[in-house]
Amino acid sequence: MRRTNRAWLRVVSGLAVLSLAGVAMTPSTAEACGGTFCDGGVPGPMPVDQSGENVIFVIGDTESEVHIQITIDPNTNAENFGWLVPLMAVPEFSVGSQPLFDQIRAASVPQYDITTTFEACGEPELDSGGFDPTAPATSSAGDSTDGATGTGDGPTVLLEEAVGAFQVAVLQDTEVGPIKKWLEDNGYLWDAKAEPILMEYLAEGNVIAALKLRRSTTINDVHPITLRYPASETCFPLRLTRIAAVDDMDIRVFVLAESRAAPTNFKHVLVNPLKIDWLNRATNYKQVITNAVDAFEANGRAFVTEFAGASSVVNTAAIYGPSWDENDFVGLDPVLAVQTLNNQGLGACYESFDCTWNHPLVYGMLLEFLPPPQGVDPADFYANLGTYAADIDVSKWDMGKGFAAGMLERVIEPGIHGEALIKTWPYLTRMYTTISPNEMMEDPIFHVNASLADVPALRTAQNYRLCNGDSVVTLPGGDEFYIPGGGPWPAIPGEEWWAEEVQTVTVKGAPMTIVNNTAAITKKRVEWNLDHNWPREPGAESSDSSESSGASGANGEGGCGCRSGEGSLGLGLGVFAMLGLRRRRGGVRAGGASVSRR
């Protein structure tokens, strides 16, 4: 059922700083399980770095969901991955869809573009043929046990099951000690800094979900996890993250609902667009957002809205394909396995060509159920299965039964569900912040407000090149800014405001402004323009109309600056967010730019 504006969900998630030592293994030094996040190949300008932590929330009347993206640093041992999630109730766990994350991110990534025109200067202008001379060369930017079990000195184990690549247990106790002992007995390496924070959650009535990768699982098998529950409140606490978080950690929250979402107990910030380097298509984006959310009254606990609009922008064809069918693999000759994947659109692996897989889990399942013989290159093996027919391990293939079951659980069912979410929930909101450990003192809550306006992902400025070599850039909101020499992007002396507005957003109606720097910013901008004789005195303009260069933002692939998580703790840190419901309001600026009303 669709939710109404009176339905409420509070989603809270947290990661304790624990690593896996392995039950029958010699304990090793805990390794950092960070991650790399990069949306490559997005058409058009994409200057915004997309590394960081990502969570999708789905808000419903009777059932709610949180989708958690888990990415492990490829330079670490995947077996040393451990994760704790405090929850208000025992959820239903399932395999999540990485393509759902990929497509939601690609459809909503904020983009900054600039179109250049030239003043007519009395001589024929050379057509730049779409090349902007001011632009940079590229834009940057299983088996389960259900029910309570336990011993007198241990926690109550409410649930144990295998979920895709993960082994999951849900623990309940009123004290940290029994949970700590259970974790250590089951191969988790305890971090003492987690104890007081975990106790806070136990005192609040939370149960603790513990996740670790199943034995023999590799990094190729890692996938998102979905938690689904019939509850009005559940939790994803940010407080646990501070144990091992880095300064200015990126957090990106996506909400699928009926209307636009906004932060409840965190502030909402409109970024000063003069701080964005439009000429270089916002290569300074993260620094601008970091400074804006650290501004007066935002205090390091605020979000900007990067996109808000119809969820139909998401390409569902890349989330699930109707040709995907696990039954095709049951009883299949293993020599035909790759050909069948090709036919279903899940692979493109042919002799004399590199093999590519159109779902991130296909390759890992092939390695598990149809491994190449020792010493044989996997790409050569999978492209030439007929040649290696006599060397295939038919016992592992087992008539394709395990592969088919894996296809259903890890690829097909998550894909069907992901596609259904986009088609069921008409609105997508994307919010972003950076936050440091000393700021992680409360868990962010979100709600839906039907009064809030759409926020486009693409922001375009106009660059008017003057005959004297200077430029006038018109920002998306219509404000003009004089650029001496046509660049670089100047900083106005004394114009120190990174946030144009700091707001609180209620359940209904327009946001309430706490800080409004618009007048001060405008005053400094106008004074700057006048100091540079802009606008011109009457009669000083060129008598000819301007000529368009046809230039626009670079259309190369985005230079997404991916990076691996760092640190000495064997725990992939996830986003911790709490979520509520409400509705939508009028136009705002998002991600540092004025946006049009719809």
Task: For each feature predicted by the language model, list its residue ranges.
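Sec/Tat signal peptide C-region and signal peptidase I cleavage site
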Residues: 23-32
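Ser/Thr-rich, Pro/Gly/Ala-heavy low-complexity intrinsically disordered linkers and tails
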Residues: 138-140, 144-151, 541-577, 585-597
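Bacterial N-terminal signal peptides that target proteins for export
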Residues: 2-16, 564-569, 584-588
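Surface-exposed, glycine/proline- and aromatic-rich loop segments on solvent-exposed faces
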Residues: 49-120, 179-205, 209
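Accessory, solvent-exposed terminal regions and/or long lumenal/extracellular loops of proteins
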Residues: 36-49, 190-541
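Long alpha-helical, hydrophobic tracts
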Residues: 129-221
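A cross-kingdom signal targeting lumenal/periplasmic-facing segments of multi-pass membrane
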Residues: 91, 95-163, 360-362, 366-377, ...
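Bacterial N-terminal signal peptides
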Residues: 12-24, 574-578
